[in-house]
């Protein structure tokens, strides 16, 4: 028996000897007695890390798995931190009692984990508003703000495979926790031993919420509407929606109806709450396969568009018909381009655009959005990947400027500030308004997108993932970033690099009149991130970002190409994609 297995067996024995339920002990015992110790090792070789985004892992017994004990331990640490901050009078407006919102999505064990979270919070004297059943992530964010709570938890693993569940921690503004509170919570969680957990729920402190909050949330979503007249004229827009078995199943159709849309169809098989996601290989709306049933129904009903939300209803997918009447999936960058263009231009036309308005994108999201904002004189800020950074920008500028929209290339968008996370109900309603407006002007949604390219120029966005598993892989990725910094790339696919950004050093270098000029990059909270960006003479942009959670390094390409007419879209796309091998070669991948 090697040293690792000895340590694993000792850790597993602690679970057999400890205060764990009999079912858990039986599962641990079976793993210990099995000839193949792989599952045992995977379950106990480390403790599931509470990171800056909370917890996420495969469900099962063991310290490296998502189960009620790990969830309770994390909640005890979070409760300790909330009470500590309150005691130190860290809030601007001290409250008599700390309160939190707790929600969950459709995943297996979600309700049990949410009730465990509520029990531990209440056992620590914290008031809990527990949703009666599954709800979208953005509604949890909304409820925290609406009820004046100091924090919250949503039990979800977003679009991960069915074996996973997770735990997202939120702060008083409805955003996922950010520095310094993320580090503070992590430190408290790491101090908690299982015997420190207070399990005995104080039921007087747990209040079930549901219908009234849904109504208030729907009213907030409705405030996003820009052109009600266009919707009224196109109220029969033919919409197919699928929640992919998740938390959008009730609220999204209700929101669409409240906006005035009357021709809404749902995919019945995927309206069933199902943590096994039985009708899809993966519940990730980025994957075309997940949209198959929606597209099939759309074909049958001759729909104008098909929209979907992921299991926790924060991200979206949009499918529309191209000029050949074929279904095409609109990627996350294209989605954000349409949102920003429509919001800025239509608010301007209707006299709603004001000087204090601003929009946000992440640093790896399309630069075409900057062109749109610049042309109309609207302030745009770049933030790090992850919606908590967009939420932080809203927090920093609250009271002085007004947020009107922001998003990231990974299929997330937020068109209002009543919520501080990605919001599929409002994003779906808004894309349907855009489709209605386009139809009102004799265009399909696809043709509207092409009209934006004709106005601002075409570019194709693509992402390359280079996977390097294991300890040696992590070292290789680290060395790749060192090499890029020590040996700067001067040319990509035959085009000279004229600007670079290093977000770890917060330095920008730009070629001006033949000389490199260095300047500082200003980011929220002066935070740094291990990201490099290159901009070339012909408008190419490359971003390099190691993943913080997976053994891979991501390369984001934005490739311009000529598109003289809308009919040249496919040709321009092919021309841009043909450059990818040359770009990869320049980067050594």
Annotate each language-model stretch with its function.
Residues 3-4, 10-117, 206-239, 247:
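An N-terminal, well-structured beta->alpha segment
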Residues 15-19, 23, 39-43, 47-48, ...:
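Gly/Ser/Thr-enriched, mixed-charge loops and adjacent short helices
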Residues 44-64, 157-160, 243-251, 255, ...:
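Conserved phosphate/anionic-ligand binding catalytic regions in large, soluble enzymes, centered on
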Residues 101-164, 262-318:
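N-terminal small/polar loop signature for handling phosphorylated ligands or for N-terminal nucleophile
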Residues 113-121, 164-171, 314-334, 369:
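Short Gly/Thr/Asp-enriched flexible loops that form oxyanion-binding sites at enzyme active sites
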Residues 170-198, 333-357, 361-371:
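Glycine-rich phosphate-binding loop plus the immediately following alpha-helix
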Residues 299, 303-305, 326, 346-545, ...:
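Phosphate-binding and adjacent anionic-ligand microenvironments
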């Amino acid at each position: 028996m090697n040293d690792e297995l000895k340590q694993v067996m000792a850790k597993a024995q602690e679970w057999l000897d400890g205060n764990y339920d009999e079912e858990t002990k039986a599962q641990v015992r079976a793993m210990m007695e099995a000839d193949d110790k792989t599952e045992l090792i995977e379950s106990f070789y480390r403790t599931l890390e509470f990171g800056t985004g909370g917890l996420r892992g495969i469900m099962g017994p063991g310290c490296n798995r998502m189960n009620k004990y790990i969830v309770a331990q994390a909640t005890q640490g979070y409760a300790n931190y909330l009470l500590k901050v309150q005691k130190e009078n860290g809030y601007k407006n001290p409250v008599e009692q700390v309160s939190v919102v707790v929600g969950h999505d459709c995943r297996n064990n979600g309700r049990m984990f949410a009730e465990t979270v509520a029990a531990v919070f209440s056992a620590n004297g914290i008031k809990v508003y527990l949703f009666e059943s599954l709800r979208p992530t953005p509604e949890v964010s909304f409820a925290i703000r609406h009820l004046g709570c100091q924090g919250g938890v949503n039990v979800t693993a977003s679009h991960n495979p069915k074996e996973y569940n997770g735990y997202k921690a939120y702060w008083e503004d409805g955003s996922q926790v950010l520095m310094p509170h993320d580090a503070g919570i992590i430190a408290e969680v790491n101090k908690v031993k299982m015997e420190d957990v207070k399990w005995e729920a104080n039921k007087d402190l747990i209040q079930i919420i549901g219908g009234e909050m849904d109504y208030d949330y729907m009213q907030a979503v409705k405030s996003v509407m820009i052109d009600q007249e266009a919707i009224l004229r196109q109220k029969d827009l033919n919409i197919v929606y699928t929640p992919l078995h998740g938390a959008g199943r009730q609220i999204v159709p209700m929101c669409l109806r409240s906006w005035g849309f009357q021709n809404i169809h749902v995919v019945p098989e995927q309206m069933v709450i199902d943590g096994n996601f039985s009708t899809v290989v993966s519940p990730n709306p980025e994957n075309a396969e997940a949209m198959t049933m929606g597209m099939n129904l759309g074909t049958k009903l001759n729909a104008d568009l098909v929209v979907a939300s992921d299991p926790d209803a924060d991200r979206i997918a949009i499918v529309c018909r191209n000029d050949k009447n074929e279904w095409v999936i609109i990627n996350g960058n294209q989605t954000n381009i349409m949102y920003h263009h429509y919001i800025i231009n239509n608010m301007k036309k209707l006299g709603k655009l004001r000087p204090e308005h601003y929009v946000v994108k992440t640093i790896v999201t399309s630069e075409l959005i900057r062109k749109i904002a610049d042309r109309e004189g609207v302030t745009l800020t770049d933030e790090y990947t992850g919606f908590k950074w967009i939420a932080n920008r809203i927090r920093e500028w609250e009271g002085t400027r007004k947020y009107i929209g922001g998003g990231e290339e990974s299929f997330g968008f937020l068109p209002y500030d009543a919520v501080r996370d990605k919001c599929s109900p409002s994003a779906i309603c808004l894309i349907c308004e855009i489709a209605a407006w386009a139809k009102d002007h004799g265009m399909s949604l696809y043709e509207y997108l092409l009209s934006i390219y004709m106005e601002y120029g075409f570019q194709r966005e693509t992402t390359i993932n280079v996977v390097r598993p294991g300890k040696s892989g992590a070292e290789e990725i680290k060395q790749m970033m060192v090499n890029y910094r020590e040996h700067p790339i001067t040319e990509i696919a035959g085009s000279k690099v004229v600007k670079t950004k290093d977000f770890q050093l917060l330095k920008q270098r730009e070629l001006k009149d033949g000389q490199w000029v260095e300047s500082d990059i200003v980011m929220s909270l002066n935070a740094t991130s291990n990201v490099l960006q290159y901009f070339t003479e012909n408008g190419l942009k490359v971003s390099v970002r190691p993943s913080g959670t997976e053994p891979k390094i991501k390369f984001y390409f934005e490739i311009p190409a000529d598109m003289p007419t809308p009919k040249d879209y496919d040709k321009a796309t092919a021309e841009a994609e043909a450059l990818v091998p040359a770009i990869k070669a320049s980067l050594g991948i």
